[in-house]
Amino acid sequence: MTTFCRVLLIFGIYVAVSCAQSVEDDVFHFTNPSQGNAVWILDESSLPWTGGYQFLRSISGMPTTLLSIVDSSTGVTLGQCVAPQDATGNFSKRWEKFSWELTASGLDCQFEQGAATRVEFDRSQNPRTFSIRIQSITGPACLRDVVVQTEQATGCPPHLSRNSFTANALNCSCPYLDAANEDGETENEDVDMLANSPQFPLFKVVDPSVLGSANPPTLPPSPCANHECHNNGTCLVSQEGAAMCLCRNGFTGDRCELDVCSAVPCQNGGVCRSNNGIAYCECPPAFSGLLCESAHTDESAAPICNPECSNGQCVLKDGQPQCECRQGFTGANCNVLDVCLGDAACSMFGPSAKCVLDDNMDKMSSASLINGTYDCLCPHPIHGQFVDCMQLHAPSATSVQPSEPAVVINNVTPSFPVLEISQVPTGAPKTFTATSTTSVATQPAVPVVQTLPTTQQVPSEPFVGFTVTREPLRPFEATTTTTLPPPFQQHIITAGEQPTWSSQQPQQPSEVPVPAQTMTTFIFPQTPETTTFPPTTGATVHKFVSPNMPDENEEEEEDETTDETEETFPTPSTMQVATDSSIRSEFFTSTFPTTTDMEETDEEEDMTEEVTDSSTQPSTTVFIQPSSTTFTTEAPTTTMEEEETTEQEEIESEEAISTTTQTSLPFWMTTIAIKMPDIVASPTPMIIMPHPQPEEKMETSTEGIESEEERTTESNEEIIPKNMEPTTPSDITHHHTSSGKQSSAVASWIIATIALIVLGSLLLATSLFVLRYIRQSRKLHGKYNPAREEHNLSAAYAMPMSHIAKEERLI
């Protein structure tokens, strides 16, 4: 029995809690009186829109606004449902029913006891979007049984899935629920029940006459009692207990005394409206404008623009039809795209750059949409005025004009080696201008300009024309070997401290001690040249023959006699400078024409690659020679004798190369420590060579230098002066003989044959292994059983019993 009572008690508590919870979940109130609301958004396609709920009137005693309809496009309130005033002065604390129906023409509001109101809407030519709101500031104190379009609000906070429902500060429960009379009974009925109930003496302990008359409690006066709101404004009590006015659209101020439309004189029957405190004129259909001052004409009298406006509308300006373009378009017919919109077209010049359309863009007419032309303007860093960004950002390097033979670039001499290159236009004649200046304190600098105009243009060269500025050339003393790898068939231009020169007037030699410096080698791809001196009457004939440029007859003889592949490098790729402090250099300037031949022979025929260039160039070259090594040739020599001597020296050098292993550093790892010896002025032009040669001839042989380089590599203690020409290097010739080609082909065939034999042997061994494996597996798995084979053989030759007579079978 006790257990049964406990179960009943628990069940009763559960039912009571469930009922209370269901009541709480179905009742809602706004926790924020100033910002709480419930909003639906719908268009005319959702009409008619119906709903309803039960409510408790506002605790402020003011009229309770149950529903507000606002035009979403303009913000104008179209209509409201306000609860009618009851006998208690809007202080009734009981649940009342309310329902509504929204249509395109108006709002119908239904209240209990048959009360109803209707609000008509103004007609609109455009489709409307409605915003339906329940505001906490003027709305009901509590709500329950909310049903919209047959959908009931569920959850806490409430949730409705249709018409974009949103709610702010709307929560479950109601703090005023105890004061509401859910059964609809009034206080008078409660008094009557107490009056009819039996009187017990137990409760009459004190005589009523002794108590006297007690004054009923009175509420303090509302702050809005003395706060008047003009122009139908509504007085509200804030959370701080102060009175404030809620003004209608078109009015503002503390008491709604200011009319925002008072200063807007709408014309031609226009009505002033207000949206968020901003006044505007709502014009009749026949008028338009800010104050409805413009009257519409008939369509037949509408302005016609020729050509037709593509991205705008045709309007009358000063009595003339003109195109009024939309944003982003310009031109006479609005068919020119404004590419300067947003200054994105000039963003590559920085944030301060601005884009400006050309002046004629607003008058340009086009049949199709085109991009407008524009200019990018940037502020000048000095005076701040806007100039063309292209001119402001143009490179400041000095370029050589086609008509100028030479340009002096630099007047300021830095304390470190400088190499500046400026590109010359491709179509201009190629002009190589090298300007050198000196910074020696004891002797004024005399710039020497070397100009090599070329009549033949080679488009394959990467540097069609360039200007090189470098520091003065000075004599140096160092010993190093630089070997250029075969792929780099290039010229070498040395920037840094090099031998310097003096003017043509004789000067006294002066010794200037200069600390050791570092010479940097710059490589520019260019065509090799063969430099020759033209024979002059009564003078010595000198010819500088490139060691790797033999004639066609000599090439054929070398192909027949040579059986090995040789690779010969030009003279400037291998440089050795003797370190002798006693050597005194003399300098001069001489001008002579330079002849360059350019040929290409087929590799497949004689495996010879030769690159030469055919042009005649006047040039100015500076030669250097120690004072102790000066050679002069009295008798002129012929070119054939010199070439034969060169060929013999090449053969001797090849034998030395085959027996000695040459080790050299790559060109990118080569630096030459140089020193500055005495400077000697030489007034008389003469050719000076640092390498001693026989007196009968003056030659430059690459093979001799290479053999000396090998001896220098083997023994670093022995220092031998080497030939160093400041002129451009000769070409590089690769000789590949036919015997080497045949030997490499035979070796390739032998290797291929051996590979095929090995592959065939592997395939044969694999096949034998597979066959052996199959045979062994058949024996192991019973497929090859000798007993079974014997039984099958005997059964095949045995006579069946059907062919034997019955008597024989019985026997």
From Swiss-Prot:
Name of the protein: Abnormal pharyngeal pumping eat-20
Signal peptide start and end residues: 1-20
Side of membrane Cytoplasmic, spans: 771-811
Residues annotated as domain EGF-like: 220-257, 258-293, 301-335
SUPFAM superfamilies recorded: EGF/Laminin
Residue ranges of coiled coil: none
Top-level taxonomy: Eukaryota, Metazoa, Ecdysozoa, Nematoda, Chromadorea
Superkingdom of origin: Eukaryota
UniProt keyword Isomerase, yes or no: no
Extracellular side: 21-749
